[in-house]
């Protein structure tokens, strides 16, 4: 199951175990059970602190296995294959169970240990999902730290019947105590906040105690990370707040145009950015979103950022780097069937539609790439483009047109998502040339029509254009003194990762120039 390189790496990790780990498998006669048995046996051979045994009498999913300590039944369970993107989740579960500490903040770990209540989590994932590991790892860690928290990570490809029965049409999909809990990427902090009543209030109280910053960067994607590094290198008090470190690149799989890095993945790049930021004295505030900007009353005064949790942070200068989010179609049925057939991530959710008919909305690079990827999984793909021609690179268009199970419809205006009350069953569109209405029967709709800036919270505070982008000059200055902006949330042309990082650096230098030239009020 594991090649020589993987075994060598895993053996090195297992040397960090400080207490014994037991792998308890519950198997049947399936081929998948045989694979898991082989995998666990190989892992046990790599360390004298790891043992493996079978107990097929347990009333749990088959095949599955528990990662625990001898004499205990506490710990995370994997049902199905833990390979692909989830192999890292498996390795971390082994380390945490074996006594190796998590890198999460001690205050958060203590909060998890003291959560009062019984919670049985189930997370459905796909092996190609790059968003799933964050959720699986967060819940695995919680199950290691708190005996009243159980977690089973379930491979949707192995347990397809459960995917169908529960109408899971997007991953990661999390259930707690048998009820839907959440869909999509969630951080450990966000999960804890949802089950630990009072956590948000405590977080706000703690943030309110923080001293004013010289520069506070709102948004922790590439632009925000670059701004934080450049600011901290100037020796000024720097804060960096955001909902999730990495921002939109966490939803990007392959990145091949970040100069000097021939190929990487969004999560890897986000991780590298975090490591770089952590090299400097930056106060990183995770899982916090801004709800309002209150500009300083006088030049040189303190600007205020109100957070969604109710906290107020103050700073002499602000850099807004809140990025953008997926654009919606804004048609009837889209909201109702979001995660029930309407999705925005072909890499995460594509495997859930294996053998089914789907549509991709949008003929730009992202839409055409999605259609190409999906064509190798699903029965049939219909790509609908609003304009008379696709905007994707010609090499991508040529590849798409070569695929036999893909139809391309131009001048198509999507008008409605059709459903049966629980899931998507079709799509309605209007031919923009003839005006005729057409219906397509399908199970999934992948929306790839661009991005919208995350700037609604700035209403009335800074000038924005009709698209909602923050209007900036060549130095990333807004119309408000001491407030700067960078990246995809601004009017800067071409929304690219490398451009965002450059703009973040520029905004930081401009903010520093403002600080040294402006007398404190």
Curated annotation (Swiss-Prot):
GO molecular function: alkyl hydroperoxide reductase activity; FAD binding; NAD binding; NADH-dependent peroxiredoxin activity; thioredoxin-disulfide reductase (NADPH) activity
Residues binding NAD(+), per UniProt: 357-371
GO cellular component assignments: alkyl hydroperoxide reductase complex; cytosol
Binding site for FAD: 214-229, 478-488
Disulfide bonds: 345-348
Required cofactor names: FAD
GO biological process: one example: cell redox homeostasis
Principal EC category: oxidoreductase
Gene3D superfamilies to which the protein is assigned, alphabetical: 3.40.30.80, FAD/NAD(P)-binding domain
Cofactor note: Binds 1 FAD per subunit.
Something else known: The active site is a redox-active disulfide bond.
Assembly and binders: Homodimer.
NCBIfam families according to UniProt: AhpF (TIGR03140)
Assigned protein family: Belongs to the class-II pyridine nucleotide-disulfide oxidoreductase family.
Name of the protein in its database record: Alkyl hydroperoxide reductase subunit F
Native organism: Escherichia coli (strain K12)
Gene name of this polypeptide: ahpF
């Amino acid at each position: 199951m594991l090649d020589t390189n993987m075994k060598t790496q895993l053996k090195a990790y297992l040397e960090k175990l400080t207490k014994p780990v037991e792998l308890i498998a519950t198997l049947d006669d399936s081929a998948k059970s045989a694979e898991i048995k082989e995998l666990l046996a190989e892992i046990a051979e790599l360390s004298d602190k790891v043992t493996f045994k079978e107990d097929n009498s347990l009333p749990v999913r088959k095949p599955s296995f528990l990662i625990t300590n001898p004499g205990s039944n506490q710990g995370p369970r994997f049902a199905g294959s833990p390979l692909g993107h989830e192999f890292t989740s498996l390795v971390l579960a082994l380390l945490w169970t074996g006594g190796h500490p998590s890198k999460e903040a001690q205050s958060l770990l203590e909060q998890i240990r003291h959560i009062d209540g019984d919670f049985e989590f189930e997370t459905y994932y796909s092996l190609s999902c790059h968003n799933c590991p964050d959720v699986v790892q967060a819940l695995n860690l919680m199950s290691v730290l708190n005996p009243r928290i159980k977690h089973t990570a379930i491979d949707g490809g192995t347990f397809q019947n459960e995917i169908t029965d529960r109408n899971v049409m997007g991953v990661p999909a999390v259930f707690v105590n048998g009820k839907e809990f959440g869909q999509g990427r969630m951080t450990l902090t966000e999960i804890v906040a949802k089950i630990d009543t009072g956590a948000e209030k405590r977080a706000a109280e703690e943030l309110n105690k923080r001293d004013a910053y010289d520069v506070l960067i709102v948004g922790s994607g590439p632009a925000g990370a670059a701004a934080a590094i450049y600011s901290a290198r100037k020796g000024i008090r720097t804060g960096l707040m955001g909902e999730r470190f990495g921002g939109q690149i966490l939803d990007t799989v392959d990145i091949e145009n970040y100069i000097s890095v021939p190929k990487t993945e969004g999560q890897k790049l986000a991780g590298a950015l975090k490591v770089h930021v952590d090299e400097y004295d930056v106060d990183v505030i995770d899982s916090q979103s801004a709800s309002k900007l209150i500009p300083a009353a006088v030049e040189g005064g303190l600007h205020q950022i109100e957070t969604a949790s109710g906290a107020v942070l103050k700073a002499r200068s602000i850099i807004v780097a809140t990025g953008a989010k997926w654009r919606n179609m804004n048609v009837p049925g889209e909201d109702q069937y979001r995660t029930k057939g309407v999705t925005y991530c072909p890499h995460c959710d594509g495997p859930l539609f294996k053998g089914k008919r789907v549509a991709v909305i949008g003929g730009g690079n992202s839409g055409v790439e999605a259609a190409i990827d999906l064509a190798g999984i699903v029965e049939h793909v219909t790509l609908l483009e609003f304009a008379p021609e696709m905007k994707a690179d010609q090499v991508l268009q040529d590849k798409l047109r070569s695929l036999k199970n893909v139809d391309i419809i131009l001048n198509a205006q999507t008008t409605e998502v059709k459903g049966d009350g629980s899931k998507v069953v079709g799509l309605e569109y209007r031919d923009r040339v003839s005006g005729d209405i057409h219906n397509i029967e399908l199970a999934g709709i992948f929306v790839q029509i661009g991005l919208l800036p995350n700037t609604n919270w700035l209403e009335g505070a800074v000038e924005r254009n009709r698209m909602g982008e923050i209007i900036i000059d060549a130095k990333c200055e807004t119309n408000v003194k001491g407030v700067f902006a960078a990246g995809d949330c601004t009017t800067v042309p071409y929304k690219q990762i490398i451009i965002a990082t450059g703009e973040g650096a520029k905004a930081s230098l401009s903010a520093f120039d403002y600080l040294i030239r402006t007398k404190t009020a």
